[in-house]
Regions:
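Asp-box/BNR beta-propeller blade signature and adjacent active/binding-site loops
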Residues: 1-347
Length: 347
């Protein structure tokens, strides 16, 4: 019998992109951006929560990155044996002066130390959900915006602290004359368990100019298919997800094409299942982030025969993440950018 168990982890003035993972001691950790009333904003910070009863109850929020005046965002929490790494973004509150930062924990996420910037993706980049391939290779998908240091300084000088008519700070995606014309998506590939990485990029995804795209938050997610191919999905705009594939373990990628998967410009999450099927957690709607859906493919993402609604509660479900374990999906999600939810959904 299918069951859906939904628990409230935390409510804040803003909650954004919670990420749940199983720790080596059996506990669960949830990491989420919280604080301020929108994002990006100067008072965005990243907190963690623990659960020792499989998600029935959660600890109070604890700051993950030590306070230094920077706005902070987290885009991935990855396990490497008993070590946990949180991939953070530090910025001025507008995604200017945007720098990567890796935080590491060897005690299941209770204390954290700073490892510095992620080599090769030091600035204007998000690191996304880790995928370990059947051969042991590790892939970290990324999105990167080719903003030079000169352009970064110009943005700070001209637009730092500038506010929009609605009172919110002007974000990097709002700048009309930013000097970039594409977004880089790709993977960081490790063959030594995550000790070192090499960067491999997809064909550039053009923005601005004749594309009609002012900016995209691509937020790539990966799945390994039955024949060893790797599929990547990205969000582009309110219509459909886009797809690229690699046939050589992530070194080269096909050009992105529409995937015929409706999406309201919201992060999707692919999860490989032990039986070879591929699960996709997303909002299967081209206009709004509702309902929260689970699609499952048994033919390497050619079709999605299983299409289920996890919840159609009439508010926005934003930025799903999670993992599979013992017949259930462990899902983290934000509701209406305020509530951090934890969901156990049986398959």
């Amino acid at each position: 019998m299918k069951t859906t168990d939904i628990k409230l982890v935390h409510t804040d003035t803003l909650s954004c992109e919670p990420i749940v993972r199983r720790m080596s001691d059996g506990s669960l950790i949830m990491v989420s951006q919280c604080g301020d009333t929108y994002e990006p904003a100067p008072n965005n910070r990243v907190y963690f929560f623990h659960s020792y009863d499989d998600g029935e109850s959660w600890s109070t929020p604890t700051l993950l990155y030590p306070e230094d005046g920077n706005a902070v965002y987290c885009t991935e929490v990855a396990l490497y044996g008993g070590r946990v790494k949180a991939y953070l973004t530090l910025h001025n509150g507008q995604f200017f002066d945007w720098r990567s930062m890796v935080m590491c924990s060897d005690d299941c996420g209770h204390t954290w130390t700073c490892e510095g910037a992620f080599a090769g993706l030091e600035s204007y980049a998000f690191i996304r959900g880790k995928l370990e391939l059947k051969n042991g290779d590790i892939l970290l998908p990324f999105q990167r915006y080719p903003v030079s240091e000169y352009e970064n300084l110009r943005l700070l000088a001209e637009f730092g602290g500038v506010r929009r008519p609605d009172g919110r700070v002007l974000a990097v995606c709002d700048v009309p004359d930013i000097n970039i014309d594409h977004v880089d998506n790709g993977v960081m590939l490790s063959r030594d368990g995550g000790k070192s990485f090499e960067k491999f990029s997809c064909p550039r995804f053009p923005i601005r100019g004749e594309t009609g795209l002012k900016w995209i938050w691509s937020e790539p997610t990966l799945a390994e298919l039955s024949d060893g191919r790797i599929a990547m999905l990205i969000r582009v705009k309110n219509e459909t997800l886009w797809r690229s594939e690699s046939c050589d373990g992530g070194k080269t990628w096909s050009a992105f094409k529409p995937a015929d998967i409706p999406n309201p410009s919201c992060k999707p999450k692919l999860i490989g299942l032990p039986d070879g099927r591929t699960a996709l957690i997303h909002s299967a709607n081209s206009q709004k982030r509702n309902p929260l859906c689970l699609w499952i493919s048994d033919d390497d993402m050619k079709s999605w025969k299983t299409r289920e609604v996890i919840s159609d509660f009439p508010l926005n479900f934003d930025y799903p993440d999670g993992f599979y374990e013992n017949g259930k999906l462990y899902i983290s999600i934000e509701l209406q950018r305020r509530d951090v939810l934890f969901i156990k959904y049986s398959l």
